[in-house]
């Protein structure tokens, strides 16, 4: 069974036992969370349930396996001949989730 979930403003296609990295979710390592924003779910051999915009009663249960930070990206702005330069860095905080169960009630 698979599902398309929305987490942190992005969409992810997940299967059972898959591991994904999403934007930071507060929680302890090893704790279980429920993701209620399921946009689509189904099995590969059967028709899928497509939400309008969400599938009612669908829940994805996941476990927080790691809290980490992504690689640094550099933002550099410059205006030629004006001696204007700005450099900034950013490291996004991420949460690694292991998908345990996909259910529809």
Curated annotation (Swiss-Prot):
BP GO terms, sorted: translation
Gene Ontology CC terms, in alphabetical order: cytoplasm; ribonucleoprotein complex; ribosome
Pfam families per the UniProt record, alphabetical: Ribosomal_L21p
Highest taxon listed in the record's lineage: Bacteria
Entry keywords, A to Z: Ribonucleoprotein, Ribosomal protein, RNA-binding, rRNA-binding
UniProt KW Ribosomal protein keyword: yes
Family annotation (SUPFAM superfamilies): L21p-like (SSF141091)
GO MF annotations in UniProt: rRNA binding; structural constituent of ribosome
Keyword match DNA-binding: no
InterPro entries: bL21-like, bL21-like_sf, Ribosomal_bL21, Ribosomal_bL21_CS
S-S pairs: none
Main function: This protein binds to 23S rRNA in the presence of protein L20.
Family: Belongs to the bacterial ribosomal protein bL21 family.
Subunit details: Part of the 50S ribosomal subunit. Contacts protein L20.
PANTHER family on file: 50S RIBOSOMAL PROTEIN L21, LARGE RIBOSOMAL SUBUNIT PROTEIN BL21M
Name assigned to this protein: Large ribosomal subunit protein bL21
């Amino acid at each position: 069974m698979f599902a398309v979930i929305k987490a942190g403003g992005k969409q992810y296609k997940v299967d059972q036992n898959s591991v994904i990295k999403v934007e930071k979710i507060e929680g302890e390592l090893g704790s279980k969370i429920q993701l209620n924003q399921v946009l689509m779910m189904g099995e590969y051999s059967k028709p899928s349930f497509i939400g309008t915009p969400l599938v009612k009663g669908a829940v994805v249960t996941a476990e927080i396996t790691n809290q980490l930070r992504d690689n640094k990206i550099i933002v550099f702005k410059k205006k030629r001949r004006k001696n204007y330069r700005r450099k900034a860095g950013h490291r996004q905080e991420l949460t690694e989730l292991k998908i345990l169960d996909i259910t529809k009630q």
